[in-house]
């Protein structure tokens, strides 16, 4: 396996305009190869065949569209749901368009060797914009969303050759543009390995190339660590009025950058127990910036000169230790917003024996309600929850909010994860007195470590993972009914480690009908066959 990784990582990156190489379908462990050569009696695994096979548990029309209040459109980010890893400034991981229904599915893949795409966004022409990385080198790429052909590429700063000494494995590294966003002018705003913010223009005509239009140097405004450790600017998002970029680093520095002047203000996160770190992306609302550290949830705003002002701080139960399968101790979810400025902030804690989903008031940081998740002693999450605000037939808010959380409590290590099963939907319901009550609506035994996505137009939640019951590793896109929690269908994407998406995110095309996911060897698209 290691030899295969090294060989494939050396693939060239000069394939602009060419048909993409497919994701390799032959990356199996020795025990799997033996099983393929000598299968037990009655067993005939055929993993090398192309994907697209459907296993259906309910009719195509089983799920119905879900009525929801759309998240607000940030005026300085690309159109929802195509601006960043979590689709919008509220980080809801939802889209209005209908997702694929499993009708004669087609599988399209691309690979450049070992490496993948942390985030995929969609420009005004609905082309894919992504940051591709192989653990050391990184590129902004423009891809055709239907063929996955590379149209243009821009090289970003690499990690230094000393990066293995930092102790952060490539599959745990969250810098270098993994969390870039696309702005309203089709510019990718990318935090780089040099602790800068690089603003690069995506061209209307790919022949003119991707080019840098502005850079902001933040290397003096991060936490200073002893060599070889390095702090990383991992997240950057625009303030609602567009005057400033807000950034956060993995070692707990939060700051603002004046878009015009480049002036920088910073604040090191710390509480009574000492310095805090950040391991998850943050959300932006009209009322402030919402960031979770490994100890507390914050709302920030900018002072008159850009200084970071703490509006409120809400501690949560970070648990006794980092749990199996997670990368840090503390909340594992990105911060998400539902409702308007009188709505809620959603995260999870890291409590034992069970974690809780927390619905926190945006206005003052007070806990609205919480609900325990999953089984005792095997309860954890390390990916963003999916959130939505329900609406009535007229489109008006009903005062009901949903969060869908995935269980990532896991044994194993890269590239094999063995998470405990569990997807759970919890609703927070606003009471007449303004309080909230939480209730568990459904639980589904699906396993996964991916960033799931909801299609409101199809009424489906989509996840991507392997089936532990398979004789050799096979990967599936599964669709779960948002209302009942029942699995509607699953489609086989492919087999072997080439199709392993290792905690990657799913992305729905803005027009619907097609889902994309990164893998550790590239990208996979699953779409319904075109009508007619």
Model feature map: region roles:
Residues 160-177, 194-196, 202-240, 249-251, ...:
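Asp-box/WD-like beta-propeller blade repeats and closely related beta-sheet repeat scaffolds
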Residues 7-159, 185-187, 529-532:
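Sequence/structural signature of beta-propeller modules
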Residues 344-347, 386-497:
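Loop/turn-rich, solvent-exposed surfaces of beta-rich toroidal or solenoidal domains
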Residues 123-125, 182-185, 239-242, 284-286, ...:
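Residue-level detector of Asp-centered blade-edge/turn motifs that repeat once per structural unit
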Residues 135-145, 194-205, 251-258, 295-301, ...:
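Structural motif
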